[in-house]
């Protein structure tokens, strides 16, 4: 254990991870200096200067406890996550998922942090790793070049990266509502998605246009590599026709409504393919194209995506874009507390550690923030149980094989298996894992 003589903790970056870390530290009575460069220096992807801004989708994904990210969210609620609390307060309809009004949510997080008496917000670019105090670096996948270079030096000079993409957003008022229908897959939750059905002929024409459309050039000579969870739709399409039909355009559970009068293949009750649109803001005036992250040129996006039934005259308020994300060699560099192995006063959090996704990033900030606060107070570190979702993430990123390490979403495969004979029914198995997880977390909290 080591600790600084400074009477505060630095947090660099006010994204989901940094905001969560700063809050967790401050709620434990410790002053925080929170640095955020947006406001003095922009990033290629962020649209505002708000904290915890969502730059890709507005979805925090599944909300059921039989979904690993749903379990992680429930664990975070029980640990008083500022991200979860404000996300809940700004939910928008999304069926069985948790989606938020991205602007209202980010504004609320920003207001709560800026008004906290123990958090000093400093709008400034950090170009060196501070050595004046315990520090949590949560500068995100869009870390500025100068700081990224210093982190890469810690990384042994290796530039670990992948490319990430965002989906387009359309104005609902410009959608032809006669060609789409409201429904959630398998009718789970409220009917929260606008569905754009395609016949086989429409799909094949769309597929041809998508796979031959011109992509925007990358800003780097480096080889393209993508994280599977945010892969551009055109890259996915080039893997084969069926890839999209089993992915974002999967029609299963999205049967035509009885009053549907549009084109269909014969008397089929289910479309050949479906493009889903999800509400993006509380007012319900904006919808994003689910799973359609893209790096096509903007003119090509307009041409190709207006082939989707209902979007023939759609106005795109934001086109899809792609950016480079960096992440660390966490198995070699970090402890399960998200603490540097070489410098105990240094913590990392967020996507740069190899956790992937909004919720996962915030969870890493929660763990790093708690442990930075404990180090400040001279207390022992805490390692969350491997039987919990919030414990399985740091376990995974610090125990994976370094050579093949890639970013990871939370999933039941990284949570410690149940003892005893394997339960064959997947839903029942996940229910048992979730039950054990929440019980173990409560025991851990009470200890």
From Swiss-Prot:
Keywords: Cytoplasm, FAD, Flavoprotein, Methyltransferase, NAD, NADP, Transferase, tRNA processing. The keyword Magnesium does not apply. Transmembrane segments: none annotated. One of its GO terms (molecular function) is tRNA (uracil(54)-C5)-methyltransferase activity, 5,10-methylenetetrahydrofolate-dependent. Its EC number is 2.1.1.74. Gene3D superfamilies: FAD/NAD(P)-binding domain. GO terms for biological process: tRNA methylation; tRNA wobble uridine modification. FAD binds at residues 13-18. Pfam families: GIDA (PF01134). It comes from the Bacteria. It is found in: Cytoplasm. It catalyses: uridine(54) in tRNA + (6R)-5,10-methylene-5,6,7,8-tetrahydrofolate + NADH + H(+) = 5-methyluridine(54) in tRNA + (6S)-5,6,7,8-tetrahydrofolate + NAD(+); uridine(54) in tRNA + (6R)-5,10-methylene-5,6,7,8-tetrahydrofolate + NADPH + H(+) = 5-methyluridine(54) in tRNA + (6S)-5,6,7,8-tetrahydrofolate + NADP(+). One of its GO terms (cellular component) is cytosol. It is an enzyme of class 2 (transferase). Its cofactor is FAD. The keyword NADP applies. Belongs to the MnmG family. TrmFO subfamily. NCBIfam families: gid_trmFO, PRK05335.1. Catalyzes the folate-dependent formation of 5-methyl-uridine at position 54 (M-5-U54) in all tRNAs. This is Methylenetetrahydrofolate--tRNA-(uracil-5-)-methyltransferase TrmFO. It comes from Streptococcus thermophilus (strain ATCC BAA-250 / LMG 18311). The gene is trmFO.
């Amino acid at each position: 254990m080591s600790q600084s003589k400074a009477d505060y903790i630095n947090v660099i970056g006010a994204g989901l991870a940094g905001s969560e870390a700063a809050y967790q530290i401050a709620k434990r009575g410790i002053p925080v200096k929170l640095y955020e460069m947006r406001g003095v220096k922009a990033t290629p992807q962020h649209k505002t200067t708000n904290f915890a801004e969502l730059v890709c989708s507005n979805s925090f994904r599944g909300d059921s406890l039989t979904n690993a990210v749903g379990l992680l969210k429930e664990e975070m609620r029980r640990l008083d996550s500022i991200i979860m609390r404000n996300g809940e307060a700004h939910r928008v309809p999304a069926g069985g998922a948790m989606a938020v009004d991205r602007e209202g949510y980010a504004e609320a997080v920003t207001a709560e942090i800026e008004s906290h008496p123990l958090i000093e917000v400093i709008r400034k670019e950090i170009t060196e790793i501070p050595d004046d105090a315990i520090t949590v670096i949560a500068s995100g996948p869009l870390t500025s070049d100068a700081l990224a270079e210093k982190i890469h030096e810690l990384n042994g000079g290796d530039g670990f990266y992948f490319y990430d993409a965002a989906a387009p957003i359309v104005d609902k008022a410009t959608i032809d509502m006669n060609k789409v229908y409201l429904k959630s897959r398998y009718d789970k939750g409220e009917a929260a998605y606008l569905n754009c059905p395609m016949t086989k002929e429409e799909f094949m024409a769309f597929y041809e246009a998508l796979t031959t459309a011109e992509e925007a050039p990358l800003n780097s000579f480096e080889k393209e590599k993508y994280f599977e969870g945010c892969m551009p739709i055109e890259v996915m399409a080039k893997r084969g026709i069926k890839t999209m039909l089993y992915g974002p355009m999967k029609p299963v559970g999205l049967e035509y409504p009885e009053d549907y009068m549009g084109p269909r293949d014969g008397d089929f009750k289910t479309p050949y393919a479906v493009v889903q649109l999800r509400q993006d803001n509380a007012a319900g005036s904006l919808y994003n194209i689910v799973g359609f992250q893209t790096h096509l040129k903007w003119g090509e996006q307009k041409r190709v995506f207006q082939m989707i039934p209902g979007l023939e005259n759609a106005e795109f308020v934001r086109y899809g874009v792609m950016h480079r994300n960096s992440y660390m060699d966490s198995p070699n560099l970090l402890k399960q507390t998200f603490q540097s192995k070489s410098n105990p006063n240094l913590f990392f959090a967020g996507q740069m550690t190899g956790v992937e996704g909004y919720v996962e990033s915030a969870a890493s900030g929660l763990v790093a923030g708690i442990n930075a606060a404990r180090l400040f107070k001279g207390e022992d570190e805490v390692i969350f149980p491997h039987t919990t979702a919030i414990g399985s993430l740091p376990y995974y990123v610090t125990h994976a094989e370094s050579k093949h390490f890639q970013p990871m979403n939370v999933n039941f495969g990284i949570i410690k298996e149940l003892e005893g004979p394997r339960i064959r029914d997947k839903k029942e198995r996940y229910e048992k894992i979730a039950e054990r997880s929440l019980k173990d977390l409560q025991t851990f909290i009470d200890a």
